[in-house]
Amino acid sequence: MRDKAGYMGVEIPISKIKELREQSGAGIMACRNALLETEGNMEKATEILRERSLFLVQKKAERSTTQGIIEAYIHTGGKIGAMVEVNCESDFVARTDEFKELAHHLAMQVAAINPQFVSREEIPEGTDIEPEQVCLLLQPDIKDPTKTIQDIINETIAKVGENIKISRFARFELGS
């Protein structure tokens, strides 16, 4: 017998759906359906959700981002600081904890790694610069080096359902 989603009688425990939701940030039904499609295989379900969220991110990429916040971070000792302007589509999302945490994380990244540009497109033509070293979006994340900053932003886009962009940032270091 098939359920409403058209799947044969595979029982997916609520605990497994909850675990996948916590890992991915995806909605309950998306997690349930991914687990049903993979007959409960967490790794395959995670990959399905990742592919779907990337598709959604690409669909949202052209949307206007006129709301957002400016986040500041001062490193312990007060000798290094950073500010970052992160934009989204609505003030509702700008007030969410997920968005605020992302902005804070990005400010910490700027303070720690000192990027020069937001994206590859900002690098002047003809310069011999390694984009992964100087572009914030291409840098490995300070908390999880297996992901880039763009990956972290994409995950947040999938969670909040809106386009997110970094407009600009500044880094300050005492004595420089």
What are these regions (language model features)?
Residues R2-S176:
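N-terminal assembly/interaction segments in proteins that build large macromolecular machines
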